[in-house]
Amino acid sequence: MKTFILSLMSLLLFFSATAQTADDIIAKHIDAIGGKDKLSQITSCVTEKNTEVMGNESTTKTTIVNGKGYRNEADFNGQQLVQTVTDKGGWAINPFGGSATPTALTPDEYKSSEDEIYLPDPLFNYAQHGAKVELAGQEKVGDINAYKLNYTNKDSAVSTFYIDPSTSYIIQVVRTGNVQGQETNITISYSDYKKTDFGVFVPYTVGIDMGQFNLKNTTTKVEFNKTVDPAVFDMPK
């Protein structure tokens, strides 16, 4: 009898887990980081970070206007790196990649990064952006048996989101990107979620593995709904 009950409980747990959909998991994620009503109030986000790369440190600033533009700028040993993406295109300055002057992103580079303009992350209101998400089961990320969501944006670029079932936070994203002219799998890890003054939770530690080198970003300041001059997204002539 005891064995039967245990088997029945295991079966019920199995069907409960498999009955979840991608939208169910995303809804829990949205609730965990602040809730739909609060997240819908976000118009912009400006983040300042300390960045460590191969033993070197720099400051990094990321500016996002929801649905309109994304700009990430860093200074490494006097060399300025900038990547900007808007709802219409993008450009970058990367002296380490051979582009010391502003250079337009290639179509493939733009497709893989165009969803950076969405706040708080691309999963929120994804269908309105023309994206699709499917649940691909669960997969280990370290010790966590994370939910695996395959996200396909409107231009068919695919990213894989991993969500911790216990917290509903995004803990990792894997996508294909261009690093120094080569197609590379980029793994982004998120941790140390904290509640901001605005009332939403964001990861204060972000690790980026590009294969050839790794970056670690530690957030020092987050400002939501700050007025942003749209000219910061314009490509210099």
Feature-to-residue mapping (PLM):
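Hydrophobic alpha-helical segments, especially N-terminal targeting/anchoring helices
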Residues: 15, 86, 139, 163-164, ...
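Flexible, processing/modification-adjacent segments and terminal tails
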Residues: 20-31, 92-157, 178-184, 234-237
